[in-house]
UniProtKB/Swiss-Prot annotation:
<dbReference type="InterPro" id="IPR008969">
    <property type="entry name" value="CarboxyPept-like_regulatory"/>
</dbReference>
<feature type="glycosylation site" description="N-linked (GlcNAc...) asparagine">
    <location>
        <position position="635"/>
    </location>
</feature>
<feature type="compositionally biased region" description="Basic and acidic residues">
    <location>
        <begin position="96"/>
        <end position="108"/>
    </location>
</feature>
<feature type="glycosylation site" description="N-linked (GlcNAc...) asparagine">
    <location>
        <position position="413"/>
    </location>
</feature>
<feature type="binding site">
    <location>
        <position position="139"/>
    </location>
    <ligand>
        <name>Zn(2+) 1</name>
    </ligand>
</feature>
<feature type="domain" description="Peptidase M14 1">
    <location>
        <begin position="46"/>
        <end position="383"/>
    </location>
</feature>
<feature type="glycosylation site" description="N-linked (GlcNAc...) asparagine">
    <location>
        <position position="221"/>
    </location>
</feature>
<dbReference type="GO" id="GO:0004181">
    <property type="term" value="F:metallocarboxypeptidase activity"/>
</dbReference>
<feature type="lipid moiety-binding region" description="S-palmitoyl cysteine">
    <location>
        <position position="1330"/>
    </location>
</feature>
<keyword id="KW-0677">Repeat</keyword>
<feature type="topological domain" description="Cytoplasmic">
    <location>
        <begin position="1330"/>
        <end position="1389"/>
    </location>
</feature>
<keyword id="KW-0812">Transmembrane</keyword>
<feature type="region of interest" description="Disordered">
    <location>
        <begin position="188"/>
        <end position="235"/>
    </location>
</feature>
<feature type="compositionally biased region" description="Acidic residues">
    <location>
        <begin position="109"/>
        <end position="120"/>
    </location>
</feature>
<feature type="glycosylation site" description="N-linked (GlcNAc...) asparagine">
    <location>
        <position position="1073"/>
    </location>
</feature>
<keyword id="KW-0378">Hydrolase</keyword>
<dbReference type="Pfam" id="PF13620">
    <property type="entry name" value="CarboxypepD_reg"/>
</dbReference>
Amino acid sequence: MAGAARGLLWAALSLCLLPEPLRAAHIKKAEAAAAGGGGGVGGELRYLHAAELGQALRDLVAEAPPGLARLFSIGRSVEGRPLWVLRLTAGLPELPEARQDGEKKKKEEEEEEEEEEGEEGGGGALPGRPQVKLVGNMHGDEPLARPLLLRLAQELVRGWAGGDERLGRLLNTTDLYLLPSLNPDGFERAREGDCGGGGGGGGEGGGEPGGRENSRGRDLNRSFPDQFGSAQPDLEPVPEVRALIAWMRRNKFLLSGNLHGGSVVASYPYDDSPTHRPTGVYSKSADDEVFKYLAKAYASHHPIMRTGKPNCPGEEGETFQDGITNGAQWYDVEGGMQDYNYVWANCFEITLELSCCKYPPTSELQQEWENNRESLLTFIEKVHIGVKGFVRDAITGAGLENATIVVAGIAHNITAGKFGDYHRLLVPGTYNVTAVVMGYAPVTKENIEVKEADATVVDFSLQPTVVAPDPNLTQFTATPAPPSTLTPSVAQVEPPATTSLHQAVQPVDFRHHHFSDMEIFLRRYANEYPSITRLYSVGKSVELRELYVMEISDNPGIHEAGEPEFKYIGNMHGNEVVGRELLLNLIEYLCKNFGTDPEVTDLVQSTRIHIMPSMNPDGYEKSQEGDRGGTVGRNNSNNYDLNRNFPDQFFQVTDPPQPETLAVMSWLKTYPFVLSANLHGGSLVVNYPFDDDEQGIAIYSKSPDDAVFQQLALSYSKENKKMYQGSPCKDLYPTEYFPHGITNGAQWYNVPGGMQDWNYLNTNCFEVTIELGCVKYPKAEELPKYWEQNRRSLLQFIKQVHRGIWGFVLDATDGRGILNATISVADINHPVTTYKDGDYWRLLVQGTYKVTASARGYDPVTKTVEVDSKGGVQVNFTLSRTDAKVEEGKVPVLNTPDTSDPNEKEFETLIKDLSAENGLERLLLASSGKVSPYRYRPYKDLSEFLRGLYLNYPHITNLTSLGQSVEFRQIWSLEISNKPNHSEPEEPKIRFVAGIHGNAPVGTELLLALAEFLCMNYKKNSAVTKLIDRTRIVIVPSLNPDGREIAQERGCTSKLGHANAHGRDLDTDFTSNYSWYSGTREPETKAIIENLILKQDFSLSVALDGGSLLVTYPFDKPAQTVENKETLKHLASVYANNHPLMHLGQPGCPNKSDENIPGGVIRGSEWHSHLGSMKDFSVTFGHCPEITVYTSCCYFPSAGQLPGLWADHRKSLLSMLVEVHKGVHGFVQDKSGKAISKATIVLNEGLRVYTKEGGYFHVLLAPGLHNINAIADGYQQKHMKVLVRHDAPSSVFIVFDMENRIFGLPRELVVTVAGASMSALVLTACIIWCVCSIKSNRHKDGFPTLRQHHDDYEDEIRMMSTGSKKSLLSHEFQDETDTEEETLYSSKH
């Protein structure tokens, strides 16, 4: 009350101090406004048309105290309506020629309406006061913002004048701009009550278009320049957009809200993604945390929005966590305004959907205002978070306009305003902030603490420099320079590069790093720069040193669709150390310069960089500083040369594969690397494939991509002057000369088993080998010289990853990326394949190419592509399915339907996330409790361990015995589920079995570890909990407990315990025809068949065995046709691909070191064929696909190897829990809704499954298009196609019609024939009756009537017959009577 009184007193005093004419005018207008009521300023809320809106805004300005409000127009719409902006802030300076005479008001207002904003517009900026804008009615049929912003302005003006503390503080510290209608033309066409946007009233959405677009039919929120757009938009048809862009360029807006309608949610950048998928892609900006904070600030104060459940008609199931969503994840909007604000204009904008109804009735406006009032005020207040201050010249104290403000770790800079003032929005935390200005030394303020309250004040004082400008450096800024004209051309939309005096920070850590030192160095930078780094290991060396890799990316740990991946590998030969140190220098350089140096920032933002400083850490530790050309430490600890240890195309590598080699091969198969360099020492040259030839002599061995490799090699050597000269080591090799510092590997000397050739031939990666100097292990003091010689080359080579062509291969059916599609270039015999999102990269030199994209089950597409010398060209392909044209309109193609069940959606998202790259790694990292098997458990301990799990986790486990072995040991089965021992047909069921051979107990221990891991993480790890809740998991750890009891540890090849107590190999006892086989079956086999395979309905089975490192799929029986081979092979591949070594296809087992199993997957009969296998029986009679995993070369390795084996297999085991939820699941019912059980589902005209109780079925299928035939007695057969994806389940819902065929014929035909037959029978009966009646009448007359002339005719026939004599006897005398009494002669034949 006291505050209000003081405010009124102040307002009265202010009026008294005004000149008499102005004071009278002010009072008069205030009275008019108060009396007007319906104008939307003082009375009930209502929609105002253009002229009314302009008048209401003018009246409000007149009502406001002096210096508080200003009205101006930023431009005009297509139809010439002004785009009004109301500026509200305290202390506005008077405009030139201030209005002193109230009687001139009307004329001046009319002139004001006709003019548009000049250079100063609504007045100049105020030092240190952040600018906020709220834009409404961008879509003409979404006009709720018009009355809301008008009411907001009214409250602010009257609250400030009335002394309201909050509103006074807001306008005293904030420069607020309100634009009620960006699309006034569309509003005039829209209709009140049109909730759906179609133009009709009452929310029906019918009738003519409802005014969404401007008068030229353009959607303003699809018309802005877009960072992911293929071309610049045409701005000529959208003067509204042109006006807004020009206005934004003249100001330094910091925060903005774009007010829409049609839902209730706060959406934040980015609004689209490089793939432009319609929905489901989280497109993360550099300031993702800030945007989520801002969106929550609005949503949390809105009574509906904060629930996350708008419950809009037709979208009742749509939910948004916390009431916010990433724009692209909701749906893709290319050319949106909020992204333009952030990318091009320094401004943080979010989009606010305020109401389910686009154009709500006037009667609802008051409620909408109450819903949004607090959210609007809170959102405006959030402009004051983060850090703020001034950037000044240290000598003159003048503010430095356009100073760049860089926050370490956030790849988005802002620029200071006209007075050197800046304001950087940040969420609470600790930051390092740098100010950079051309001509001044940059200054960094470290450990700045940002709190939840008002912004932390940080001022910068910069010293001018006298350094000459470097034309190769550009200032990294997100804000373009002000344009020279009001209306920007298309070219002016691009931010122009400006020169900068910023110098990159050079490394200072020049010394030789031994392993411990290197490890600390890597951990230090991973810890100091967590937003752009990730430190991981790809394996261990012989001496168990980690093979570390530092990833540097703006989104570490994530493969961003469309972003290429690059790698550097150093120190492959332990005594060639320059590469090791250069890569550590490069890590330091990239981390320290990210966000401040444009080149580094661009590289990190556009490339996922992986750096392995040392591939041979053991050899390094043996090497000696000063070694010029020696070999000590060159090889690994097993004394093998790692660069002769890779499989070779021309020669058989007989050396056993080394752990370092296997780890790197696995690494290369895991990531979609495009380009690589292997850093060596001993010369100064770049050599490129091939490294050897068929004859093993020094001769040019040309690869299909020879021109590309030469260009790649030159890109490095050109930046190293000494290398480019071509005569590197005159003291050591005086005759050696390499033109331009490059050479073909084999032409120099033959290297069989080299890494660079393996890269090219086995992955999509192009690799060259770089010799960095003549001295292999130079003195530490020489290391800065090597950095100076190579730093430009190292950066330039990374840039080459963007040369050639890149893009996406998409499915025409659903627009999703196609995995493993092939990209072929005519006349270059080297195809590459697509990654998980359908993204690909193909390095090419300048030229014209015919490029073909193809994939199994799709029609190939060929395009002619022009590649220039400047960079990469995006070329996307959309492939149609091979049979789409034949089946179009006849057979429905089904994909996973949208479900309104949020829990179902959440689980589908989980499956997709776990299927993504690093998805399972993230699950494992987030898991609680350390599970690591360390000993083998004999039968007694195994039984006690399983009982312990059952007793400790009774709500999710059930322990039963399937039967007994020969020696009466129990065959235990542990079920893990949220409802154990309770049938839930809709849940897929998976079984893990092990120990069918007792001498291979690794599988048993792995399954016990898996069971413990699942139980320990239930209700602690969200992903594990959801998997258990949605899956029935059965674990049978030991099928042959008798054999296990006699097997011996370290018996790598021993067969002791292989068979059961009767000496029978149980994997030969599952005979094909079980129906007649009974008496001689082993008790273990009988228990497994009767109580596991046939009794329980499983979707997938995984059997663990030993003796190799691979996966087999059915059948083990030779010459057996495999109906669903692709699916079985796919399931096996999923397991192998998630194992670090198995997918390499080189088990490397003793006596089989040359064994090669492509992908680590092979059909059982091709590896070890035999009859009576468990997996053959499971597929044939259990209708369950089963794969057999051979866990290690040694049957019974030492217990010390168990932790490593668990670490290798746990991801693969978990991948099976994810995979069992994919494929196809669905329900079968008739039209009445009755579920149909035991219906037959025939897949691809071969595999059969049967519906369970409730009509449910589930079957695993390989990704691709599959045919489904559904058959049930008494119903018509159904045929359809279903699209199965690699990362999500597909659902089908089959509704049967009654059978319309009888005996295989159409019902109508059968009825017609039956009716005709009945009619014929009736007609025949009638004829017979009539004939009988006539004959009966002749008998009643006495003698029958003779047929006249008939005898003469027959006699003539007889006389003319010239047959045999017997023919004379063949003719009978015929009387005309029918009675038996009159028959005189009867023929006998």
